[in-house]
UniProtKB/Swiss-Prot annotation:
Catalytic activity line of the entry: 1D-myo-inositol 1,3,4,5,6-pentakisphosphate + ATP = 1D-myo-inositol hexakisphosphate + ADP + H(+)
A molecular function GO annotation: inositol-1,3,4,5,6-pentakisphosphate 2-kinase activity
Enzyme nomenclature, EC number: 2.7.1.158
Protein name listed in UniProt: Inositol-pentakisphosphate 2-kinase
GO cellular component: nucleus
First-tier enzyme category under EC: transferase
Function noted in UniProt: Has kinase activity and phosphorylates inositol-1,3,4,5,6-pentakisphosphate (Ins(1,3,4,5,6)P5) to produce 1,2,3,4,5,6-hexakisphosphate (InsP6), also known as phytate.
Signal sequence, start to end: none
Family listed: Belongs to the IPK1 type 1 family.
Naturally occurring in which organism (per UniProt): Kluyveromyces lactis (strain ATCC 8585 / CBS 2359 / DSM 70799 / NBRC 1267 / NRRL Y-1140 / WM37)
Length: 266
């Protein structure tokens, strides 16, 4: 069976095998440590993320699978400079969330789309980042200004501006734009759900930081005129990331170009 490279994250790499995505942890240099992390992480996802009532039906389906480290996996692990000190590897296995024959088009720093040649199915991938916040400024908009990113829209505000900004000149079907806009304006949209989830766990920093870094997929079908939402990247964050977050928050708090919050947070 042939492995097909799918993508890479900061601490993982994904391959397609027999129609499913195998997600391999690269967080540690030793396979045995990655195996322990994957098992703990899978438990965290089930107990802390999938258990949230507003997200239970949109967290990507996944299973934990122990695979024998044969030649094809040995080559992958060696390419990633992982020390192979175990005969088996723990993988999180998930469905592929876009059509296999689709092409990917980067829209900006946080957005990309996958589409087939006939535009009958389009999948929009995006990271909405921090939605709920207790500050009087919008963390996303302020962080974009701090980083010098020319991003005027916000996932918390004005869905029409989001659609106009991201899809202007992209030659996507009008039906797609209409259906996606209607979805984003609904109270059941994935951004509204994530806002509610982040607010719900605001006193649980570990879970909150996970929810602030998820990736969303919205898959649209021309045949059914439906939009299906899925979230991935729901991993537990390492404790040492907290120092980075704290230093970023200090920089944002003193940044003169802070952007006013779009919601009246309580």
């Amino acid at each position: 069976m042939t492995l097909l490279f799918v993508g890479r994250g900061n601490a993982n790499v994904c391959y397609l095998l027999s129609g499913e995505v195998y997600r391999i942890s690269l967080r540690h240099q030793k396979l045995s440590r990655n195996n322990a992390y994957v098992q703990d992480n899978f438990q965290f996802i089930d107990s802390k993320i999938r258990s949230l009532p507003m997200l239970a039906d949109v967290v990507v389906s996944m299973r934990l699978e122990e695979v024998f480290v044969d030649t094809k996996w040995i080559n992958v692990l060696k390419d990633e400079n992982i020390l192979i000190d175990d005969s088996h590897m723990q993988c999180i296995v998930m469905p592929l969330l876009h059509a296999k024959d689709s092409t990917c088009e980067q829209l900006d720093h946080f957005n990309q789309i996958y589409r087939c040649s006939l535009n009958d199915a389009i999948t929009w991938e995006f990271k909405p980042k921090w939605l709920y916040q207790s500050s009087d400024y919008c963390r996303n908009c302020t962080h974009n200004s701090l980083k010098g990113r020319d991003i005027e829209y916000c996932f918390l505000h004005d869905p029409e501006l989001i659609i106009e900004t991201l899809f202007a000149g992209r030659q996507v079907p009008e039906e797609f734009l209409d259906d996606i806009l209607q979805y984003l304006q609904s109270s059941d949209s994935i951004t509204q759900r994530l806002y509610a989830a982040q607010r719900f766990v605001k006193d649980d920093l570990s879970t909150l930081m996970t929810l602030r870094d998820v990736t969303c997929f919205l898959t649209w079908s021309r045949n059914t005129r439906s939009v299906k939402a899925t979230i991935i990247d729901v991993d537990q964050k390492p404790a040492n990331k907290l120092r980075h977050w704290q230093s970023t928050e200090s920089a944002l708090a003193s940044f003169p170009g802070k952007k006013k919050a779009h919601f009246n947070h309580q």
